C-alpha cells in the first residue's frame, strides 16, 4: 500500500449566505469557506425568479459577430426588393 497517496482530509466550516454555518470534512486546504449562492437563496430552491441580463449577452453576441442595429433593417429592404 502506498503512503501519502491521498490528500489530507480535514474539517472545514462552510458559512452560508444567510450566516449559518455547517461543519463538514473536505480535502480543501482552508479551514473555512463562504458561499454566495446556496439552497437558501438560489432561485431553483426558493421558487423566485431573477432577472438575467440577456440584453448584455445579446449586445456581446452582436459585437462579436459584427451585427449592428443598422444591419437589422437591411433584411426588410432586401425582401421588399425581391417582391417587386
From Swiss-Prot:
Q: Which domain of life is it from?
A: Bacteria
Alphabetically, the GO molecular function entries are: rRNA binding; structural constituent of ribosome
**Would the keyword rRNA-binding turn up in this protein's UniProt record?**
yes
Q: Name one GO cellular component term.
A: ribonucleoprotein complex
Q: Which HAMAP family match?
A: Ribosomal_bL31_1
Question: What job does the chain carry out?
Answer: Binds the 23S rRNA.
Q: Which Pfam families match?
A: Ribosomal_L31 (PF01197)
What the record says about family reads: Belongs to the bacterial ribosomal protein bL31 family. Type A subfamily.
The primary gene name is rpmE
Quaternary structure, per UniProt, is: Part of the 50S ribosomal subunit.
Region span, Disordered: 1-41, 63-84
GO biological process terms, alphabetically, are: translation
Transmembrane intervals: none
What is the species of this protein?
Answer: Salinibacter ruber (strain DSM 13855 / M31)
Q: Where is the composition biased (Polar residues)?
A: 21-30
Instruction: Spell out the protein name for this chain.
Output: Large ribosomal subunit protein bL31
Q: Which InterPro entries match?
A: Ribosomal_bL28/bL31-like_sf, Ribosomal_bL31, Ribosomal_bL31_A, Ribosomal_bL31_sf
Q: Could you tell me where the Acidic residues compositional bias lies?
A: 68-84
**Keywords (A to Z) from UniProt:** Ribonucleoprotein, Ribosomal protein, RNA-binding, rRNA-binding
Amino acid at each position: 500500500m502506498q503512503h501519502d497517496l491521498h490528500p489530507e482530509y480535514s474539517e472545514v466550516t462552510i458559512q452560508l449566505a444567510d450566516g449559518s454555518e455547517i461543519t463538514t470534512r473536505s480535502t480543501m486546504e482552508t479551514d473555512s469557506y463562504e458561499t454566495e449562492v446556496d439552497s437558501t437563496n438560489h432561485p431553483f430552491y426558493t421558487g423566485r425568479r431573477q432577472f438575467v441580463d440577456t440584453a448584455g449577452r445579446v449586445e456581446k453576441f452582436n459585437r462579436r459577430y459584427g451585427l449592428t442595429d443598422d444591419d437589422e433593417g437591411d433584411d426588410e429592404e432586401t425582401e421588399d426588393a425581391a417582391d417587386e
